């Protein structure tokens, strides 16, 4: 009998694949193991590391994921969550993967609203640790992995979530069933426009990402999701900490007290190969 935090992995035989030899992984005691004797221990928090030799980007440290968790829990991305929920309710996927999931907000929220097997990964072990600790329902299969080679079996997924993250269309095509869908959110032109104005930057231009997606896949549905929120000082500080737009910016060079509202804008696509 497995403890509750590890029970979720009892239904994953041969869905996970070995990152070293690509053979299917099966649960053996408290590890996932392949027939070539590669073993990956299940952490007591409820995740498995399938990228033991990989290093996460220095720009995505524990503090940035904690800040992101605060911003998401404050509701600033709830309209994007609602759009995802709308499409997932329509599709009813039996299996879903959240790529580059960060601290796991979308997977946790969506899994609590709809049935299905939810998988979620990030290259950052810190983020997956946060995600698994926050998963009170203990249902999402959290794992550390690399987007370049996702350790899941061919045609094992009904849907993939890609929210504000890079895409690997070759891997997505391999993983999705023939009728499977990609749900991809890209920033809208007004995304974080208030921060861009303070920095003296022009509005975001999403055309290149939009064009590349349409070259790779057929668009089945498209939602425009934009909302503006009032910021508390605490959420403003967390937003400034988590935003990739500010990674190369000296925050002390600007007066951020003037940032009292923020616009979160995205285009959400449902697409198929």
Q: Which residues does each PLM region occupy?
A:
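Conserved SAM-binding loop of SAM-dependent methyltransferases across substrates and taxa
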Residues: 103-114
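Conserved SAM/SAH-binding beta-strand->alpha-helix loop
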Residues: 124-126
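Conserved beta-strand signature within the Rossmann-like core of class I S-adenosyl-L-methionine
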Residues: 180-190
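Conserved Class I S-adenosyl-L-methionine
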Residues: 12-14, 225-273
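A short acidic, Gly/Pro-enriched loop at the edge of an enzyme's catalytic core
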Residues: 148-159
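Conserved class I S-adenosyl-L-methionine
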Residues: 93-102
């Amino acid at each position: 009998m497995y403890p509750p935090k590890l029970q979720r992995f009892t239904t994953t035989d041969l869905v996970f694949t070995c990152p070293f030899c690509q053979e299917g992984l099966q649960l053996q005691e408290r590890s996932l193991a392949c027939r070539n004797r590669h073993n990956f221990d299940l952490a007591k928090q409820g995740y498995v590391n399938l990228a033991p030799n990989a290093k996460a980007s220095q720009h995505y440290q524990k503090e940035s994921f904690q800040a992101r968790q605060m911003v998401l829990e404050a509701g600033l991305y709830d309209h994007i969550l609602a759009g995802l929920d709308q499409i997932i309710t329509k599709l009813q996927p039996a299996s879903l993967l959240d790529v580059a999931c960060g601290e796991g907000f979308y997977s946790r929220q969506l899994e609590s609203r709809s049935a299905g097997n939810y998988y979620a990964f990030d290259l950052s072990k810190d983020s997956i640790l946060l995600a698994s600790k926050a998963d009170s329902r203990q249902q999402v299969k959290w794992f550390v992995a690399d987007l370049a080679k996702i350790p899941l079996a061919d045609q094992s997924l009904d849907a993939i979530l890609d929210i504000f993250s890079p895409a690997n269309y070759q891997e997505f095509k391999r993983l999705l069933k023939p009728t499977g869908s990609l749900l991809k959110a890209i920033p809208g032109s007004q995304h974080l426009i208030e921060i861009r104005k303070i920095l003296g930057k022009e509005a975001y231009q999403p055309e290149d990402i939009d064009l590349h997606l349409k070259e790779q896949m057929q668009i089945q549905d498209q939602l425009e999701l934009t909302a503006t929120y009032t910021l508390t000082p605490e959420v403003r500080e967390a937003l400034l900490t988590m935003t990739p737009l500010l990674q190369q910016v000296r925050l002390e060079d600007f007066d951020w007290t003037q940032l009292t509202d923020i616009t979160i804008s995205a285009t959400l696509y449902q697409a198929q190969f």
